[in-house]
């Protein structure tokens, strides 16, 4: 963030907030564990020190650090002190965290500041932490930073004619380079397991890049569908759902994937898709079905809960309609789908899309570049890979 403020002629206002747990984080304990693992990988790629002084952050001093930072709220020193506290906390510097925590003039001072910040964020239309907001649009973490920098570049408000090397390196790190032909070493790799929900726009978007990566390396993709979160007893509040759809639309435009006319398949539509998928798999048409069903749901507003809609999708896949109807009448699919959910949860993920390749587990459609990087590393025998 300091580099962003230095490179562009912008005014940056930093707010101390916290992520809302109730309803917005369906598996908070799992999220904490996964987030640390994910941030370790990101920090390694971006060259940022992360938990290099301890295995875990000093959570016992989190409240004290927040109170110490809150003491400078409203002053020019606030953002600098907040950035310093964040670095200390997420590098695992227990000694420094203890010292700053003791310096807090008033215990509980952060609570009032956080409440004000949360109220502002809610009025602006969001609920999560690590969010940037500019002129009506939200940008989450480093994964959406390129949208903001593109917007600022288009406005011509850069202070320098040369790009900021640090900001540029983040963009470069997340680019995918694929081999012109599958390397020999890829033949020994296991299948990519892809946990998918027909109600998840991110699942639909990530299918395309996952298949592209797998095809480039000659690796099979095993689609493992699960029920939508709301059909598994996990809440998806309105503001979260609205942001997801807006963000997915933005991502779809960037990737050139059809998106926008939506028919929510929750309930009967999702169940029918799951049943038909297993039939499609038995006919070697699983890949075709998830792609066509996704396009129908997320870009053509096809109602897959109806026979007319489902017939439209399955016709494109070359599936026999009488057999499709028979598949939708049974309940045999439920055990397989539940097994997929259990497997995903055992690996430390609760949401989709989740990708597993051996011991690597990635959550989110914006980790496709990390999957490609991991496969490249597994295939690198020292002779290099032609990309």
Where do the PLM segments sit?
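Conserved strand-turn element in the central/C-terminal portion of the radical SAM core barrel
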Residues: 55-58, 103, 195-199, 263-267, ...
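Conserved aromatic-histidine-acidic binding/catalytic patches
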Residues: 27, 136, 184, 198, ...
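C-terminal cap of thioredoxin/glutaredoxin-like
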Residues: 1-6, 84-181, 191, 205-213, ...
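Short, flexible turn/loop "capping" segments at secondary-structure junctions
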Residues: 185-188, 269
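Generic beta-strand/beta-sheet core signal
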Residues: 15, 135, 195-197, 224, ...
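Structural alpha/beta surface segment adjacent to cysteine/selenocysteine redox centers
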Residues: 1-88, 204-297, 382-386
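Short active-site neighborhood of thiol/selenol oxidoreductases, capturing the structured segment around
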Residues: 187-202
């Amino acid at each position: 963030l300091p580099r962003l403020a230095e490179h562009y002629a912008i005014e940056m206002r930093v707010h101390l907030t916290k992520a809302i747990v109730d309803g917005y984080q369906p598996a908070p304990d799992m999220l904490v564990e996964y987030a640390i693992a994910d941030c370790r990988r990101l920090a390694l790629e971006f060259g940022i020190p992360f938990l290099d002084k301890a295995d875990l952050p000093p959570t016992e001093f989190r409240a004290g650090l927040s109170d110490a930072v809150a003491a400078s709220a409203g002053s020019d020193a606030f953002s600098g002190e907040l950035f310093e506290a964040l670095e200390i906390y997420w590098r695992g510097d227990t000694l420094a965290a203890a010292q700053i925590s003791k310096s807090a003039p008033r215990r509980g001072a952060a609570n009032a500041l956080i409440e004000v910040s949360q109220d502002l964020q809610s009025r602006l239309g969001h609920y999560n932490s690590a969010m940037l907001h500019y002129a009506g649009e939200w940008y989450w973490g480093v994964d959406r930073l390129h949208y903001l920098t593109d917007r600022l570049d288009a406005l011509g408000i850069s202070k320098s004619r040369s790009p900021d090397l640090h900001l540029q390196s983040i963009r470069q790190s997340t680019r995918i380079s694929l081999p012109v032909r599958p390397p020999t070493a890829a033949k020994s790799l296991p299948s990519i397991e892809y946990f998918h929900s027909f109600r998840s726009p991110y699942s639909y978007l990530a299918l395309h890049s996952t298949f592209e990566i797998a095809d480039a390396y000659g690796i099979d993709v095993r689609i493992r569908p699960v029920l939508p979160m709301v059909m598994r007893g996990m809440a998806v509040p309105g503001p979260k759902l609205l942001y997801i759809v807006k963000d997915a639309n933005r991502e779809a435009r960037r990737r050139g994937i059809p998106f926008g006319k939506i028919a929510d398949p929750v309930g009967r539509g999702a169940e029918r898709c799951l049943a038909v998928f297993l039939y499609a798999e038995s006919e070697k048409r699983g890949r075709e079905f998830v792609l066509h069903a996704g396009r129908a749901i997320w870009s053509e507003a096809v109602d897959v809960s109806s026979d007319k809609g489902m017939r439209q999708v399955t016709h494109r896949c070359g599936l026999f309609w009488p057999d499709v109807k028979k598949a939708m009448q049974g309940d045999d699919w439920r055990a397989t789908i539940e097994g997929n959910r259990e497997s995903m949860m055992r690996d430390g993920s609760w949401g989709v899309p989740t990708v597993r390749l051996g011991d690597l587990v990635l959550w989110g459609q914006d980790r496709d570049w990390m999957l490609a990087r991991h496969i490249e590393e597994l295939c690198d025998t020292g002779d290099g890979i032609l990309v």
